[in-house]
From Swiss-Prot:
Domain of life: Bacteria
Gene Ontology CC: ATP-binding cassette (ABC) transporter complex; membrane; MsbA transporter complex; plasma membrane
Annotated source species: Escherichia coli (strain K12)
Outcome when changing E208Q: Improves basal ATPase activity and increases transport activity
Record's protein name: ATP-dependent lipid A-core flippase
Annotated compartments: Cell inner membrane
């Protein structure tokens, strides 16, 4: 099996073809139009022979009467075919790019969390936008040039051989030399194109970091650092572009030099008496004009090669992502609503790409309807435990059970439907407040249910003050809201979801003391009759938990109730003393 980076242009295009095939009707129409367009140019040149031999050579004035009409007709045909071909190719190109982007977008949504841990957002955005657009270049502008100029070359060759095969046969020597030159340049174009795509991802990442962290940049005076970083990747992109221009600029004169040598040799051969006797003024003019006309399509084909190779390199990059293994969803068990029993048995887990396990031999039972709190220092593994319940990652050893069945037995959709998550890193969408609360299920919930969830999360106070209430668009990631307001929207979302298992990962971390007190009552109500896993730094929020589990360096070191752990005077007692000074 070939690696994508080793695929030839032909193999890459063959793989792209199934994406293009549904729109081949547009390609056929465009191809016919392009061939007619090239034929009109070739036929225009062929008119030189009757014009010189008959119109002027024999003073046959009838040629000068009908020829202007033919020229006008050919120009009209040329204009129509040019429009039809451009429109059809652009239509096909747009469809192909949309299809590729949808496939890429859908495939990325099915990728495991570990995939996104390794990739920068800017690079992935570049794949969906820039690389997909490069595919358009290969399937639109490049294709137009290849078909039109290819048809022109074939037409000119046929016409030259028809009028003087002796002179035209010399050009056969030209074909393999030009082919070798194009192949060498193609390899160079593709290598540069791959580097340009990677660099474009770095440019996007640099810009994205500045835009998302512009407040931090301003506060910490990072303008110079960010400017230097962006200048560095931008200059790298410029250098790659210059390499592309250099390769293209060198290939043009090489191709033209080869063609010029062939033309010079033809001119020399035409001086031989045996050849000259068979030529008329019109014939030799048509042959020489055709040879000169060959320069343009040869140059265009050489130039379009750079564009085509960029598209093929982009295809390979996209295929690399599309070939990446998606999240494993091999479970068959579907459950409408779980009871909520969760159990970890001898679970060991290591993050992909790391050597040291994040969790070691975790044994933990969370009975249905009970609340278990995880505490510990930052990086101890608390959030990792929570992420394993939703199977964002698969464990190395042991098993995790829900209602007595291994999580891997459930379909991912069914499993995740049992869990509501409120984390410290709330993500909101550039949509209305109502649609954010009822995210992905706007048609399932009534307006009254959405309002009730917002009220229980103590969010209606600030929502009612907005211009359009629940219909207010809150900007990208809730940029128009405060941290506490964003957190309450997320809690309202969890309330509305009404899942049997609840994960609260620092759910009140962004709230002020007053808001925290107000919302704690709602969280207490939410946790009733639900299996709750609460992760908290503020120990005051988990004192009423049925069990508190202390995690240190990926290992459970203590467990018990709040009072039991204080009496034990272990790690939990130390953490409590640090927070409350007792």
């Amino acid at each position: 099996m070939h690696n994508d980076k080793d695929l030839s242009t032909w193999q890459t295009f063959r793989r792209l073809w199934p994406t293009i095939a549904p729109f081949k009707a547009g390609l056929i129409v465009a191809g016919v139009a392009l061939i007619l367009n090239a034929a009109s140019d070739t036929f225009m040149l062929s008119l030189l022979k009757p014009l010189l031999d008959d119109g002027f050579g024999k003073t046959d004035r009838s040629v000068l009467v009908w020829m202007p009409l033919v020229v006008i007709g050919l120009m009209i045909l040329r204009g129509i075919t040019s429009y039809v071909s451009s429109y059809c190719i652009s239509w096909v190109s747009g469809k192909v790019v949309m299809t590729m982007r949808r496939r890429l977008f859908g495939h990325m949504m099915g990728m495991p969390v570990s995939f996104f841990d390794k990739q920068s957002t800017g690079t992935l955005l570049s794949r969906i936008t820039y690389d997909s657009e490069q595919v358009a270049s290969s399937s639109s502008g490049a294709l137009i040039t290849v078909v039109r100029e290819g048809a022109s070359i074939i037409g000119l060759f046929i016409m030259m051989f028809y009028y003087s095969w002796q002179l035209s046969i010399i050009l056969i020597v030209l074909a393999p030399i030009v082919s070798i030159a194009i192949r060498v340049v193609s390899k160079r174009f593709r290598n540069i194109s791959k580097n340009m795509q990677n660099t474009m991802g770095q440019v996007t990442t640099s810009a994205e970091q500045m835009l998302k962290g512009h407040k931090e940049v301003l506060i910490f005076g990072g303008q110079e650092v960010e400017t230097k970083r962006f200048d560095k990747v931008s200059n790298r992109m410029r250098l790659q572009g210059m390499k592309m221009v250099s390769a293209s600029s060198i290939s043009d004169p090489i191709i033209q030099l080869i063609a010029s040598l062939a033309l010079a040799f033809v001119l020399y051969a035409a001086s031989f008496p045996s050849v000259m006797d068979s030529l008329t003024a019109g014939t030799i003019t048509v042959v020489f004009s055709s040879m000169i006309a060959l320069m343009r399509p040869l140059k265009s084909l050489t130039n379009v090669n750079a564009q085509f190779q960029r598209g093929m390199a982009a295809c390979q990059t996209l295929f690399t992502i599309l070939d990446s293994e998606q999240e494993k969803d091999e479970g068959k068990r579907v459950i409408e609503r779980a009871t909520g029993d969760v159990e970890f048995r001898n679970v060991t887990f290591t993050y992909p790409g790391r050597d040291v396990p994040a969790l070691r031999n975790i044994n933990l039972k969370i009975p249905a309807g009970k609340t278990v709190a995880l505490v510990g220092r930052s990086g101890s593994g608390k959030s990792t435990i929570a992420s394993l319940i939703t199977r964002f990652y698969d464990i190395d050893e042991g098993e995790i059970l829900m209602d007595g069945h291994d999580l891997r037995e459930y379909t991912l959709a069914s499993l995740r439907n049992q869990v509501a998550l409120v984390s410290q890193n709330v993500h909101l969408f550039n949509d209305t407040v109502a649609n954010n609360i009822a995210y992905a299920r706007t048609e399932q919930y009534s307006r009254e249910q959405i309002e009730e969830a917002a009220r229980m999360a103590y969010a209606m106070d600030f929502i009612n003050k907005m211009d359009n209430g629940l219909d207010t668009v809150i900007g990208e990631n809730g940029v128009l809201l405060s941290g506490g307001q964003r957190q309450r929207i997320a809690i309202a979302r969890a309330l509305l979801r009404d899942s049997p298992i609840l994960i609260l990962d620092e759910a009140t971390s962004a709230l002020d003391t007053e808001s925290e007190r107000a919302i704690q009552a709602a969280l207490d109500e939410l946790q009733k009759n639900r299996t709750s896993l609460v992760i908290a730094h503020r120990l005051s929020t988990i004192e009423k938990a049925d069990e508190i589990v202390v995690v240190e360096d990926g290992v459970i070191v203590e467990r018990g109730t709040h009072n039991d752990l204080l009496e034990h005077r272990g790690v939990y007692a130390q953490l409590h003393k640090m927070q409350f000074g007792q």
